[in-house]
Each structure stands twice: as C-alpha cells, then as structure tokens.
Amino acid sequence: MANIDLSQYGITGTTGILHNPSYKTLFEEETKEGLTGYEQGQVSELGAVNVKTGIFTGRSPKDKFIVDDETSHDTVWWDSEDYHNDNHRATPETWNALKEIAKKELSNKKLYVVDAFCGANKDTRMAVRFIVEVAWQAHFVTNMFIQPTEEELANFKPDFVVYNASKAKVENYKELGLHSETAVVFNLTSREQVIINTWYGGEMKKGMFSMMNYFLPLKGIAAMHCSANTDKQGQNTAIFFGLSGTGKTTLSTDPKRLLIGDDEHGWDDEGVFNFEGGCYAKVINLDMESEPDIYGAIKRNALLENVTLDDKGNIDFADKTITENTRVSYPIDHIKGTVKGFVNDKSAAPAAKSVIFLSADAFGVLPPVSILTPEQTKYYFLSGFTAKLAGTERGITEPTPTFSACFGQAFLELHPTKYAEELVKKMEANGTKAYLVNTGWNGSGKRISIKDTRGIIDAIHSGAIKKAPTKKIPFFNLEVPTELEGVDTNILDPKDTYANPADWEAKAKDLAQRFIKNFDKYTKNNEAGKALVAAGPQL
C-alpha cells in the first residue's frame, strides 16, 4: 500500500491505496475471488485477462463536456449550429457538482493511483495521475501510457488529474444541463477530468489525447491522430492519417520498417513522437495468419475488452454479441519491430519525410496516389475524407461519404485550421512531402489491391515517386504519377479503369460537389479557410 495523500483532491477515508501497482499485483487484483459485475476479469487461453465494460462499449460523444471559463471560452472549438462537434459547454457550477459526485464515490474506498506520462518527449509530455476504484482500469492506463522510472515516480508532480467514478451516476443531470446520467467532463483551468457512469477504458485514453490536442498546438507543436513508422536506421519517418477501415494500421505495420506508434503522435522541433506507451487494437475477427503481430501481443499483461470467452477461457474473436468494437490494450513492447528498444529508448524518430493521407474512396474517383501541394495538403487534411459501401433496402450498394476534420474530428479541441497550420509549418520546415493515397475502389468495381498500395507506399518511402513522370487529373487538379515501379500502370489514372471515361467524369463531378459542400463550413468567418477553396476541386 502506498504512502500517497489524496485529501488534497477532496478524497478522504481511503481504506488503502495501490500506487502504480505491478502487473503481477494488477492481475491478482482484477481476477481475485469475490469480484462481481464489470469489476471481474476472466483469464483467457492466451493469458490475457478479458473484461466487460457494460452498456458503453465505445466512447460517449454526446456526454463529453468542457468547462466554459476564461481559459476555454475563446480557445476551444465549441459545438455550434454552424458546425456540430463533441465539445459541449458546461458551466463552472456543473463542474463543481460533478467533481463532488466523483469525490464522494472515490472516498472511503480502496483505490488505485497510476502516475504516468502522456508524450514520449520529456520537454512536452504531460504527467497524468489517474485515480480509479477498479483494478482493471488501473491496468488499462498502465498499458496505454508511458510508465515512469523509479526516480521519476519518486518525484512525480501531476500536470493533470483524472477521476474515474464509473460506478456513480449523475441523477440530477437535467438541472446540470447534461444529456444523461453519464458525464465525461474536462476542466482546462484546473487541468482535471471527471468520468461518471461509463466503464469504457477508451474515455481515459482519448481524454488525454484530447488534452494533448488542446495544449500542444498552442505551443506550436503539431498533435495528430495518426500512425507512424520509420526505417531500420530510425531516419526515414512516415506519418499515416486515415479514418477507420482505410488501412492505417495495416500499412504502418511493415516488416521492413519500425513502428513508432499506432494512433496518437506529436511533431515538435526534435521530430515525431508517440503520446502513448501502448496500443489499443481492434480484435473483431482477429486471425493469427493475417495479423500475427497483434495476435502475438495478446498474452499476460494484455487486457482484452468485451471479447466472448467460454468457461474454459477459449476466445471467439468472431463473436459480436457484445459489440463489434472488441479491443485489446497492451504495452508497446509486446510488438516486435518498434523504434523503442531498437533505435533508442523512446517511441520517437526525426521529422517526417512523408505524410500520407489514406482515403478508402468507395465512389471510385480518386487516384491510387496523388502528390499534394502545401495548399492541397491543408485542404485534404481539413476535409478528412473516406467513404464506405453501405447496402440499401433494395440491395443496391451505395457509397456513403465521411468527412472528419484532420482525420480525427472527435478529438479536436481547437479549430481544425489550427491543426492544419501546425502540420504544414512542420512539413515546410523539414521539406516533407504529402500524398493522398486511395485504398478504396476504382472503375473496375474492385478494391485497389494491397499489393499495388504497398508498391505505392514503398515508392513514397524510397523517394522513387518524386522522380516519376506525372500529369494532372481534371476537376480535382491532382498531380498523379503516370508510372511507378511495382504498381500496375493501368490504375494510376482512375479514368483509365472505366470502360466509358464519361462514367468517371460524372462520378468525379458528384464527389467534387460533396467536397465543396463539406468545405463550405471552413469559409464562414474564417479567412484561412476561404484562402484554401482554390486548392480543392473546381467545377
């Protein structure tokens, strides 16, 4: 039991505190006899413990609030009629009431306190203290954040405190101006987060990502929802942006290269660095052959979420009974081939040479690869486009577009143009090139092959794409290579994949119109946004 005083936070009468417990202790605590409900962990055949998170098997965006005070009022990108997002306003009075609920829930209990860092660079990292009453929640943040050394722990002074009161409820939520009995609320002045009535671990992970997304760009550091890797010498860094289903994880996990991280990164004057100390991978339909790295990472100390196990601990990765969003969190050293431990002692590498935007275009319009200008980089970054095929009631499959600012709108606390400015500033200072890669469909009706996409990514890493002959395609005015080693030449111009080129033109005009309509929101009262219209599609 630790010698740590929580009365400074208004938490009193604790019956015991486990401070940064070891994995062995966490395993014992989350599987011990007598635990019931969602506190109870079940040991799987692979050694990892599986837990259930109740009705919340993902984040609850409608229940995310930020205290509207002098710190946040003029800086936060608030939810508005013009542009809906997840940054809902809470009053200081509501904050005080919610913190009281959390303090009451956490008082007179045995608690777990985990002190950890968010950010691999010492100058800009955030020291976070997590106060929780559930053992597996302590395990989750131990996996996902960067663990301090013994010396760092002895001198730990938190920059941010998270109170996880998942067992409590906000019964008077209506009078507090909330949407439900659940609340995930941030106070940027006191640097605290309160979580009430949701057990989902990702609220702590993405909560701290949102805070890095607030504080870092204000210091001139790019904060990014992306994966990143580098070559075996740790010098040729690449960043991959992309929404779910675009191949971000698949393409950044490359046996020829070293992984920096799979989800959250910053870019400062030293280079690109991971915010996290672990990975949080989807495991629905996980297969040992196709994703050996993730499968191999599921062992003791990994934590499975909402996966179906039988009485003997056998895992059914195909079972969606609880959710399709089944997950595993594990420390990054469960993966072979990472920068940390291979090139240096942290998940970081020099400035990126390539920035890759991944879009799975189900309209069949975008080229497999386009070379972007700085203005186009900002435009397509702010657009954050992908599309998926959705079946309609008549069995016709129609593309559904998704536009998510900066490929991570849910986690942006500042206006999207701020993230675009910081990214392009870093790119211009380092001579970084940006590419738009379509991992979706073309006129053949088939998805662009993973072989061709990997050939494109290899040509970007090697620099071969910079020497390739190019041409411009109409409406989008994108520069595309006309030949590229290891890639089928016939697919490089999407128009060539259509039996009738007029079909591509009709679809291109339709998609261009969707981009234009989506971008309109950036032009309202925003000169930076207006200036970028010319970089987008023109009709």
From Swiss-Prot:
Pfam families according to UniProt: PEPCK_ATP (PF01293)
Co-factor binding comment: Binds 1 Mn(2+) ion per subunit.
PROSITE patterns from the UniProt entry: PEPCK_ATP (PS00532)
Keywords from the named record: ATP-binding, Cytoplasm, Decarboxylase, Gluconeogenesis, Lyase, Manganese, Metal-binding, Nucleotide-binding
Disulfide bonds: none
Compartments it resides in: Cytoplasm
Pathway stated in the Swiss-Prot or TrEMBL entry: Carbohydrate biosynthesis; gluconeogenesis
Binding sites annotated in the UniProt record for ATP: 206, 225, 242-250, 291, 327, 447-448, 453
Any single GO CC term annotated in Swiss-Prot or TrEMBL for this entry: cytosol
GO molecular function: ATP binding; metal ion binding; phosphoenolpyruvate carboxykinase (ATP) activity
Catalysed reaction, written as an equation: oxaloacetate + ATP = phosphoenolpyruvate + ADP + CO2
Binding site for substrate: R59, Y200, K206, R327
Family: Belongs to the phosphoenolpyruvate carboxykinase (ATP) family.
Protein's name in the database: Phosphoenolpyruvate carboxykinase (ATP)
Organism listed in the record: Selenomonas ruminantium
